[in-house]
Amino acid sequence: GIYIKQSVTNLIQKENSIEISLGNKKINFDKIIVSAGAWSNKIANMVGDKFPLDTERGYHILFETNEKLINRPVAWSESGFYLIQIHDGIRAAGTVEIAGLNKSPNSRRIAMIERQSRKVLPQLGNVKSTWMGRRPTLPDSLPIIGKSQKNNNVIYAFGHQHIGWTLGAVTGKIIDSLSRDHI
């Protein structure tokens, strides 16, 4: 198999293969694995499958620091975030909102995390960077792992929410078996 990280612009289902358009390039595959996280529904819809996939958005702030202020992760459950010392500063991460793929980041969430972080550690430095991550989520919290109901040559592996790293290896083994028709 091959791994391609590029936007799929079209998908044509043929009798024994799937043709994927990547911009101007078209490639035929015997099977495809859709593991595009929060963007997986775009391809699933091209196949004809519909999933209630949404996006959990989590926010992160990296604070500058010239000294080690904490020696273990610090959780503040009241505000729903953690502070973690990493090599280039202190990361504050947390909070979750269901807001889809296209909505702009919520600056109030970043401001709240910064404000609450400074309550816990007033000696935090300047904000070095901020970012927002998008986790694929489904209403029942269960990931989509398995063959498409519309096309046996399409295999899905997405929707792991907060446990993608934890379930990644197990999902990989299942997908490997499915792709070889061992399951």
Predicted regions and their residues:
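Hydrophobic/aromatic beta-strand patches that form the interior of the parallel beta-sheet core
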Residues: 4, 33, 155-157
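A conserved short coil-to-beta-strand element within the FAD-binding core of flavoproteins
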Residues: 4-18
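Short loop/edge segments at beta-strand edges and connector loops
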Residues: 4-7, 22, 128-131
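Short beta-strand element of the conserved SAM-dependent methyltransferase core
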Residues: 11, 61-63, 157
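Active-site substrate-recognition segment that forms the wall
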Residues: 17, 27, 31-152
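Short beta-strand segments that buttress and anchor functional surface loops
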Residues: 20-22, 159
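C-terminal lid/capping helical subdomain adjacent to the catalytic/cofactor pocket in oxidative enzymes
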Residues: 142-183
